[in-house]
Curated annotation (Swiss-Prot):
<dbReference type="GO" id="GO:0016758">
    <property type="term" value="F:hexosyltransferase activity"/>
</dbReference>
<dbReference type="GO" id="GO:0006486">
    <property type="term" value="P:protein glycosylation"/>
</dbReference>
<dbReference type="InterPro" id="IPR002659">
    <property type="entry name" value="Glyco_trans_31"/>
</dbReference>
<keyword id="KW-0328">Glycosyltransferase</keyword>
<dbReference type="GO" id="GO:0005794">
    <property type="term" value="C:Golgi apparatus"/>
</dbReference>
<keyword id="KW-0325">Glycoprotein</keyword>
<dbReference type="GO" id="GO:0000139">
    <property type="term" value="C:Golgi membrane"/>
</dbReference>
<feature type="glycosylation site" description="N-linked (GlcNAc...) asparagine">
    <location>
        <position position="291"/>
    </location>
</feature>
<keyword id="KW-1133">Transmembrane helix</keyword>
<comment type="pathway">
    <text>Protein modification; protein glycosylation.</text>
</comment>
<keyword id="KW-0464">Manganese</keyword>
<keyword id="KW-0812">Transmembrane</keyword>
<keyword id="KW-0472">Membrane</keyword>
<keyword id="KW-0735">Signal-anchor</keyword>
<dbReference type="Pfam" id="PF01762">
    <property type="entry name" value="Galactosyl_T"/>
</dbReference>
<feature type="transmembrane region" description="Helical; Signal-anchor for type II membrane protein">
    <location>
        <begin position="46"/>
        <end position="66"/>
    </location>
</feature>
<keyword id="KW-0333">Golgi apparatus</keyword>
């Protein structure tokens, strides 16, 4: 509009080119030629209309070009993973490797995406979670996302068992709170599932942080959001309860590490597996990694820790992510060190939720609020 106004003002404030006899001194008074003046005025109006139409055309054409040429943010594809809680909006079809039927999805912007790792035999755990801290229906899921900036989904692979898949489909239709991964759901393949999770999460959500959590912990979403909202100097940050420990090389023991000879006698610093956080820059690197290019150890938490050693990441140790009891500062509660999660999650989740300290205490401790 300023462009049009400028041209109109310029045209109307300057006089039309005068015939030469207007400027010649004469003893006679000459009347302006009315037909010539009208003709000149008409030409000015035509010029104004022409330039206005051209400007409008250029503006519309530019808008159409921008909309057609600008796709969504770069997305790393990951098999056939999909988010069941929303209708995926697509802007462009790609011939590709199958994610969402070859469609690039629009990534939702978030503070954090939290993937609750679950399995086909964990239906009772999911029921217990939905009756405690995890939202029990799609509307509640959306309200929690709006309140905290965190999106929560159960994350599960696929099974060759048709009955298990049919039962899962029923649960999906009822709750719509899953991310489905295009990988086999097997305990011995947890490192592969974890990598598939981060790739899928990065494809579906544009988050500042990506959280891996197990389905047997009690979590305070509000406090997790507060933790993630803290300012950090490092763009590559790895947050969790950090630990070291002896490498288990005895095949008869639970945490046996087949490639222990590559590690030595003691594990490097890494986060406990029940919950940890990776910043967006780290996950972007994992999403871009070629399949088969990352070493996989037997244990998922060790595998992630080894990848972190290969990157220039900052290890942020936060014990509120592994609190054995609910406290004014606890974010995640689980039975450390007895179990890698709650020892009896179906019962313990409900017991903890009935405790005011777990479910009703303020997001911030009183001393922090006063400050």
């Amino acid at each position: 509009m300023p462009l049009f106004s400028h041209r109109f003002t310029t045209a109307s404030s300057s006089s039309p080119a005068s015939p030469s006899y207007y400027n010649k001194p004469s003893s006679k008074t000459h009347k302006p030629n009315s037909s010539s003046s009208s003709y000149t005025s008409s030409r000015i109006h035509v010029a104004i209309i022409f330039f206005s139409l051209v400007s409008v055309f250029i503006g519309v054409a530019g808008t159409i070009f921008a909309l057609s040429s600008t796709g969504p943010a770069s997305v790393y594809r990951c098999g056939g993973s999909k988010d069941t809680s929303r209708v995926v909006s697509a802007s462009r079809k790609l011939g590709g490797d199958g994610g969402n039927n070859g469609v690039v999805v629009e990534r939702r912007k978030l503070l954090g995406f939290v993937g609750i790792q679950t399995g086909f035999d964990s239906g009772d755990r999911r029921t217990a979670l939905r009756s405690t801290w995890f939202p029990s229906d799609p509307d509640s899921l959306l309200r929690l996302e709006q309140a905290t900036g965190l999106a929560f989904r159960f994350v599960i692979g696929k099974s060759k068992d048709a009955k298990k898949m049919a039962e899962l489909e029923k649960e999906i239709k009822e709750y719509r709170d899953f991310v489905l991964l295009d990988t086999e759901e097997e305990y011995i393949r947890l490192p592969y599932k974890t990598l598939a999770f981060f790739k899928a999460a990065f494809k579906l959500f544009e988050a500042d942080y990506y959280v891996k959590a197990d389905d047997d912990i009690y979590l305070r979403p509000d406090r997790l959001a507060t933790l993630l909202a803290n300012e950090r100097l490092h763009s590559q940050t790895y947050i969790g309860c950090m630990k070291k420990g002896p490498v288990i090389t005895d095949p008869k023991l639970k945490w046996y590490e087949k490639q222990g000879n590559l590690i030595g006698n003691e594990y490097f610093l890494h986060a406990y597996g029940p919950i940890y956080v990776l910043s967006a820059e780290i996950v972007a690197s994992l999403a871009a990694a070629r399949n088969g290019s990352l070493r996989m150890f037997n244990n998922e938490d060790v595998t992630i820790g080894s990848w972190m050693l290969a990157m220039d990441v900052h290890h942020e140790d936060n014990r509120a992510l592994c609190d054995p009891h609910c406290s004014p500062k606890s974010i995640a509660v689980w039975d450390i060190p007895k179990c890698s999660g709650l020892c009896d999650p179906e019962s313990r989740l409900k017991e903890l939720h009935k405790t005011d300290m777990c479910s009703k205490s303020p997001t911030l401790p009183p001393d922090d609020i006063d400050q």
